[in-house]
UniProtKB/Swiss-Prot annotation:
PANTHER family: 50S RIBOSOMAL PROTEIN L4, LARGE RIBOSOMAL SUBUNIT PROTEIN UL4M. This is Large ribosomal subunit protein uL4. The gene is rplD. It comes from Xanthomonas oryzae pv. oryzae (strain KACC10331 / KXO85). GO terms for molecular function: rRNA binding; structural constituent of ribosome. Part of the 50S ribosomal subunit.
Length: 200
């Protein structure tokens, strides 16, 4: 049972989702895989065989000085790169069971550390950043709060858009990086039920 902030009501939560043992290795693997999936992997450099330039020997072999060949060698300015980077995929395989287990572990650890705050509802009547700031001040959520609602709220999303450290997600848009990086996760009671349906 978790207490709903701002009232005496309690919400029953699943131990499998909010009381799971924390596995740092699992969470690290899933977070790294998630971040790597967002990498373009388009970095490219040219080797000595790919750069434009003549392959003619730059100077005579004899006569003193170093014994250079083509000016496309990596030692020269404008030459190729010794171990040239090539486009590649950084994708790591993480199956669904691992991903969900990591999300459960993160929620459980947030709960144990007192960084998980459940509220009855979290919405704004109009798109006003000032109203959102006042609401967050009343909750004491730290510098980097993550607000999780059952469904996307346009007023809430637009109000938080120009607050650089405030994130707003619906349950469907949750990801491990957002959860790990938040000082406090503010989640509505309806969103808790939806999270349990997803992860249990």
């Amino acid at each position: 049972m978790l207490v709903i902030t701002g009232s005496n009501n309690k919400v029953s939560v699943s131990e499998a989702v909010f009381g799971r043992e924390f596995s740092e290795d699992l969470v690290h693997q899933v977070v790294v895989a998630y971040r790597n999936a967002g990498r373009a992997g388009t970095k490219a450099q040219k080797t000595r065989s790919e750069v434009a330039g003549t392959t003619k020997k730059s100077k005579k072999q004899k006569g003193g000085g170093a014994r250079h060949g083509a000016l496309t060698a990596p030692i020269f300015v404008g030459g190729g790169v010794t171990f040239a980077a090539k486009p590649r995929s950084f994708e790591q395989k993480v199956n669904r069971k691992m991903y969900r287990a990591a999300i459960c572990a993160i929620f459980s650890e947030l709960n144990r550390q007192g960084r998980l705050m459940i509220v009855d509802a979290f919405d704004l009547e109009a798109t006003k950043t000032k109203d959102l700031i006042e609401k967050l001040k009343g909750l004491d959520v730290g510098k980097r709060p993550l607000i999780v609602t059952e469904e996307a709220s346009e007023h809430l999303y637009l109000s938080a858009r120009n607050l650089p450290y405030v994130q707003v997600r619906d349950v469907q848009g949750l990801d491990p990086v957002a959860l790990v990086g938040a000082d406090t996760v503010v989640i509505t009671a309806d969103a808790v039920k939806k999270v349990e349906e997803w992860l249990a």
